[in-house]
Amino acid sequence: MLKKYQIFVGATYNDLMEERSAAINQIIKQRHIPSGMENFGAMGEKQWNYIKKEIDNSDYYMLIIGGRYGSINEYGISYTEMEFDYAYNRGIRIIPFLIKDMDTIPIGKCEPTEEGREKLTKFRRKVEEKAGLVDYWTNKNDLQLKIANSLANVLREYPAETGWIRIDKDTNVAGFLITN
């Protein structure tokens, strides 16, 4: 049976729009299901609660870190770091991509404050320590290629227990049903 996996894409938004789009396109090209804040509409629900639900419903968490730390909550932690911590603590496999050279990032896409730069540096270190193998990217095209290779490898080597399976009319679904 062919399984499709849901992959949550975590990244800051304004500075990584093109990179997020490239990641989502690569996930779709490999016939899987992307999830991320681009798809959030009006819900009448707190943002963090909805993000947690989306991560819980995902099989993998793809993290892209560029030059910004991101929007922070009332405790001074970025939503991207909160997503990473949440996925890590839930045992969801993380597929991390970090910008290789912070000095090559255009000024408008860099963290504007010293405090933000310090938080970003600490976050990068945390990801490097906790997430296992990390891949480093230099530009959007490089990132897209690395995502394609990493996704193929991760899905082959570490297939998630869950996922989406198409059930057609000839499939006996009795084995899939859960009874109370």
Q: Which role fits each region the language model picked out?
A:
Residues 36, 95-98, 136-137:
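A structural signal for short, well-ordered beta-strand segments and their strand-loop junctions
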Residues 53-54, 83-86, 90, 126:
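Hydrophobic/aromatic ligand-binding patch that stacks against planar heteroaromatic rings
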Residues 63-67, 98-101:
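Short loop/turn segments at strand-loop or loop-helix junctions that form parts
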Residues 104-180:
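C-terminal interaction surface of TIR/SEFIR-family domains
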Residues 42-45, 67-89:
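Conserved TIR/SEFIR loop-to-helix hotspot centered on a Trp-containing motif
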Residues 1-64, 90, 169-180:
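Conserved N-terminal substructure of TIR/SEFIR domains
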Residues 89-102:
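A short helix->loop->beta-strand "cap" motif at the edges of active sites that frequently abuts
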